[in-house]
Amino acid sequence: MTKKIELAQIQVLFLGIWRFLLHLRQRLVEDQINIRAGHLAYVTLLSLVPMVAVTMSMLSAFPVFKGIRGQIEAFVYENFLPAAGDTVQVYINEFVGNASKGTAVGIAALVVVAIMLISAIDKSLNNIWRTKEKRSVVVAFSMYWMVITLGPVLVGASLVATSYVVSLKLFEGDALSGVMPLFIERLPMLFSVAAFLLLYMVVPNQKVKFWHALLGAVVAALLFELGKKGFALYVTKFPSYEAIYGALATIPILFVWVYLSWMIVLLGAEITAAMPEYLDYESSSDINETNLDGQPLAAQDTPAAQPETTSAQSSQVLETTDELAATAPQSSTLDKP
């Protein structure tokens, strides 16, 4: 008896997962995340150099970050730009150096382009959440400016804190000697989960539950790590872009990776936004009343519907009886001799 109950619970669990995946697939088709990811990838490439320039300028404003700027750059390029990170780093640093020599108007233009990227991300995520209320211009600009100014500082502070913890003598013992390499190896994964979690909870202009955002963040971080390894393997083992484009191979490689990254980010957002919809639907309907395709079973006649049909038929019978009763005297009169 207990095994039957456990088997039924497992079946209900898998059926619920299957129904959620069907709902998620429908959402992905409706929202066209491939088109949104292409738009965000295009805006990202336009905003990449201005964003890096603004970020490095913010880090340079704090003396504590001057000594670890190279470490921050190496960490970002190695973990977020697989395979082509070294080449991209050389080009971006050169572009940033040229951009920093510009006038005040040019620097202001860089800030505007960087804000355009954050605005595009904001609009895409709020469209996924079906948000109807829009932020005011003042609130939106304040949020964008906070991301540009405080974002690099928080990233730098977290890396400084991590470097400090790793350098402590507390972790030099034999018991913890194997813990630190494992922690450092998992550090990019933890940063990815934290970044996605913050993105899914803060950017949408509505309340997002922590556990829903955490689920989307974990899935997105896992896919991001797998995507890095898979893309790096593809670029190194199948160098078709280098054979076709030669020295310009970095451009399409960077664009493809940015596009895949945004696909992963939007997929995590779709999972986070679909969870409350699915749970609300499940709370209002019985999971056993639908088939595996997510379609409701054929509705059967309910007792409540039968009285309506009976009353309708009764009214028709009464009308027919009245008509016959009205014509009956006439016919009887005509039949008299």
Swiss-Prot record:
Annotated region described as Disordered, given as residue ranges: 291-337
GO cellular component annotations of the record: plasma membrane
UniProt keyword terms in alphabetical order: Cell inner membrane, Cell membrane, Membrane, Transmembrane, Transmembrane helix
Signal sequence coordinates: none
Primary localization: membrane
Spans traversing the lipid bilayer: 4-24, 45-65, 102-122, 137-157, 183-203, 213-233, 247-267
Coiled coil feature spans: none
Subcellular location: Cell inner membrane
Family: Belongs to the UPF0761 family.
NCBIfam families membership: PRK01637.1, yihY_not_rbn
Source organism of the structure: Shewanella sp. (strain MR-7)
One Pfam entry name: Virul_fac_BrkB
Comp. bias intervals (Polar residues): 307-319, 328-337
Protein name in the entry: UPF0761 membrane protein Shewmr7_3708
Membrane topology, from the record: Multi-pass membrane protein
